[in-house]
């Protein structure tokens, strides 16, 4: 196919146009008075949502070059979502603001490479200041505030997530399920999560969330490498196919030929199956597999116990209520086998007491926490499917934001932190940078005020006036868009996780700097 090539300003302007279209669509959702966006779906009802990254993923333009701009800014949103789980709209607004101002300066003759350096130095300065000002999350009140804010100012959701974290611990697993009623309820069940995801993306059942969801599955645990599918697994697969229940395979590894056979069975709809590599190494892997088998009332198929794959019966397999597998993790939600789990926990506690090695004790503590903590399941209630999808997205954001807050602390929300730091950045840049590097830093200094401007605009206020008002106060003072007041953000509970604020700026600056240093675009030419 022939290509279309654009250079310099033409290239950057085409990218900027695509970025503007996406930013406008996403930024209408920013703040407590942000509006919703309706997404048309090829199948099923339209989706009404308020989530930046979901909107960004849906936007695709006819013009190839503008679409490249959309894809670039979408990357800033997606990366922020992957790292912090929230702050995607802020990242989009920041990236767009840096690009717009940078383009003006490049057109006026500034050196793009020097501007890029200035942007990077300014970003590092702001990130270090966010870390310096962040307050650790010490009480349940702060957790409720973060969760409420991220779920769209829903205090009940905030309390529910705080309650869930209290029950399963700060490292615990919180899972979302679609409920059967209109009420959202919290349930604590036995279960555990480990950091290994599906071996092949062909196993995915929910392509939108890129995860595998299995209800009431069998689980095969083995410390062996699965090689000859015909001899080893076929008898078992045939037994499971008769039950019409899904299967989760947790093994040391699966060879290519064996994996191909399993994937083909999955794609043909013969068997709903997913394969995952077992966590850990050596003896620790065996112990973790045993923990999981006890949790699910199954057996580990290991040669140490004289068992082989070709003799496996259904009653040797683990059973779970639900399994969720993403590319990075596997969550098993089990049904009560409390007595067995308790005695296993007691056994691990005794091992901790008798162990001399600090490393060994740490790993045992980790196992104990995973096994005894359980999983908090929030059953999301809604009147319609459209409301259900929106609620699940908001709850997902709230859970991610809460975990991010626990990790790196909290700062004043509503764009206030960036506005206060922008004054310090201005002074620092004037004293430490010169020429085009200084221009790059001042671009960031102005850009970081844009999220607050947009929050104020969405609430019907003048963004520039609000920014100046906030700047004239102390660090903890900001703008409460819901009520239109200048308030103490900590007292009012308008707080952001430091990790979200940091990630949004880092990813936005990274993408924006790349766009400003773009000199040529090559895209497929559309034939008339």
Swiss-Prot record:
Gene3D superfamilies: GroEL, GroEL-like equatorial domain, TCP-1-like chaperonin intermediate domain. It is found in: Plastid, Chloroplast. Keywords: ATP-binding, Chaperone, Chloroplast, Isomerase, Nucleotide-binding, Plastid. One of its GO terms (molecular function) is ATP binding. It catalyses: ATP + H2O + a folded polypeptide = ADP + phosphate + an unfolded polypeptide. One of its GO terms (biological process) is protein refolding. Belongs to the chaperonin (HSP60) family. Together with its co-chaperonin GroES, plays an essential role in assisting protein folding. The GroEL-GroES system forms a nano-cage that allows encapsulation of the non-native substrate proteins and provides a physical environment optimized to promote and accelerate protein folding. This is Chaperonin GroEL, chloroplastic. It comes from Pyropia yezoensis.
């Amino acid at each position: 196919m022939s290509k279309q090539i654009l250079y310099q300003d033409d290239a950057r302007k085409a990218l900027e146009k695509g970025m503007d279209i996406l930013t406008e669509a996403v930024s209408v959702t920013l703040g407590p008075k942000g509006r919703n966006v309706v997404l048309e779906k090829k199948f099923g009802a339209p989706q009404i949502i308020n989530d930046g990254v979901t909107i960004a993923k849906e936007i695709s333009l006819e013009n190839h070059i503008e679409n490249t701009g959309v894809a670039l800014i979408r990357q800033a949103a997606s990366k922020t979502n992957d790292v912090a789980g929230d702050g995607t709209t802020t990242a989009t607004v920041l990236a767009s603001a840096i690009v717009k101002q940078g383009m003006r300066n490049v057109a006026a003759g500034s050196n793009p490479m020097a501007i890029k350096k200035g942007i990077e130095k300014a970003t590092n300065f702001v990130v270090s200041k966010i870390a310096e000002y962040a307050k650790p999350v010490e009480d349940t009140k702060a957790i409720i505030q973060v969760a409420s804010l991220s779920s769209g100012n829903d205090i009940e959701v905030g309390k529910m997530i705080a309650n869930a974290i209290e029950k399963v611990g700060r490292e615990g697993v919180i899972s979302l399920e679609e409920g059967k009623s209109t009420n959202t309820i919290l349930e604590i069940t036995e279960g555990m999560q480990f950091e290994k995801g599906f071996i092949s993306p062909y196993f995915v059942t929910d392509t939108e969330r890129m995860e595998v969801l299995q209800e009431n599955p069998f689980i095969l645990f083995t410390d062996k490498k699965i090689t000859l599918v015909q001899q080893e697994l076929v008898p078992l697969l045939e037994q499971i196919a008769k039950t019409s229940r899904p299967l989760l395979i947790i093994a040391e590894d699966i060879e290519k030929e064996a994996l191909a056979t399993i994937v083909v069975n999955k794609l043909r709809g013969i068997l709903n199956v997913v394969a995952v590599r077992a966590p850990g190494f050596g003896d620790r892997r065996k112990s973790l597999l045993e923990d999981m088998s006890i949790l699910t009332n199954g057996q580990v198929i290991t040669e140490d116990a004289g068992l082989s794959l070709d003799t496996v019966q259904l009653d040797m397999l683990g059973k779970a209520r639900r399994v969720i597998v993403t590319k990075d993790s596997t969550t098993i939600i089990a049904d009560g086998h409390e007595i067995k789990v308790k005695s296993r926990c007691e056994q691990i506690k005794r091992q901790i007491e008798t162990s001399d090695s600090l490393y060994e004790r740490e790993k045992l503590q980790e196992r104990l926490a995973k096994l005894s903590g359980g999983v908090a399941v929030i059953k999301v209630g809604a009147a319609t499917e459209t409301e259900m999808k929106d609620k699940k997205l908001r709850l997902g954001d709230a859970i991610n934001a809460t975990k991010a807050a626990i990790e790196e602390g909290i700062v004043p929300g509503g764009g206030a932190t960036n506005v206060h730091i922008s004054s310090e950045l201005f002074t620092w840049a004037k004293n430490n940078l010169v020429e085009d590097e200084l221009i790059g830093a001042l671009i960031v200094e102005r850009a970081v005020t844009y999220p607050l401007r947009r929050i104020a605009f969405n609430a019907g206020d003048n963004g520039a006036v609000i920014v100046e008002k906030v700047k004239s106060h102390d660090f903890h003072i900001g703008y409460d868009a819901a009520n239109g007041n200048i308030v103490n953000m900590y007292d009012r509970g308008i707080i952001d996780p430091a990790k979200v604020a940091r990630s949004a700026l880092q990813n936005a600056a990274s993408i924006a700097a790349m766009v400003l240093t773009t000199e040529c675009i090559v895209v497929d030419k559309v034939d008339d």
